[in-house]
Amino acid sequence: MHLREASEGPTRRGGDLSSIGRKKADCPICRRGRPRDVVAVLRSAWVSAPSRAALPGYVAVVAKRHVVEPFELPASSGFAFWRDVLLVAKALADLFSPVKMNYEIHGNTIPHLHVHLYPRFHADPFVGRPIDSREASFTRSKAERTRISRAIRRATAGSRSTRTVHR
């Protein structure tokens, strides 16, 4: 099995679910020290906004602590992680005004807890079907990534979540 983290999101080649390593040493995010394309650093998570995405506003909220499943987080860390996910979702909703926000957790491609946030729109290319991240047809500009970073900063200003970055 070959694990990698592509700029447009997590992907896996070959193997099956039984071959996914759950250990921190098997995790490409942990080996690198953080995910790629980070636009915000929060108390319990990083927010990744790759330059190519399936939909405008897509981000992944990636837990700083290495776990594969949400239930593996201690209670206080779990609450902090979900608070960060909800703050980011609200920031995206305020910025993009979607008709719906989709929350997806898989973990069968990269063994590290991360939540995909997809703002959904009336005329998006996935109406009536699941989002396929391999159909990354939206390319966002540096300005778009900066807008996302600033929206998250505003949303987290009054919380215990810490800082926002843009690279």
Positions of PLM-derived features:
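HIT superfamily nucleotide-processing domains
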Residues: 2-5, 9-167
